[in-house]
Amino acid sequence: EMQRSLVGSEMCIRDRMYEMIEVVNAILPEDRPRYLMGVGTPVNILEGIERGVDMFDCVMPTRNGRNGQLFTAEGVINIRNKKWEDDFSPIDPEGTAFVDTLYTKAYLHHLVTCGEMLAAQIASLHNIAFYLRLVTMAREHIAAGDFRPWKETMVQKLTQRL
């Protein structure tokens, strides 16, 4: 699968981007933080962390949230899909944002399908909290010394369409 990612103003094939991160990080002083701009799928972030990147910024959590896409530790939810219409379970039972357990998938599906702006706000809050939780978990697994196996498991989950 050829996914493309935007790095600065260059379009790069995903694997080439990871290779370039390694090349650049080998040149940069080790006592300085590494910043990767405009890259932001959860998988990209984990791959970047594995390669020594310290900081990221991207619009993906909010842009995708505005379009009805929710990132979870079990995979990606397109809340616009009819399958969520009657799912009264929490948006993300493992989530850390207040919206994750306060609202249901069915309610968020309803808001999205009728164009209610509250849907974009809820989804954006959820996605930002998920990203924060993801990097917090990454930090914990780095400290525990088991980042790589945890990351491999997470990458498989994060690419699932729910």
Regions found by a protein language model. Give the residues of each.
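Alpha/beta catalytic cores of nucleotide-metabolism and tRNA/nucleoside-modifying enzymes
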Residues: 15-36, 42-162
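Single conserved hydrophobic/aromatic residue that forms the stacking wall/gate
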Residues: 1-8, 12-13
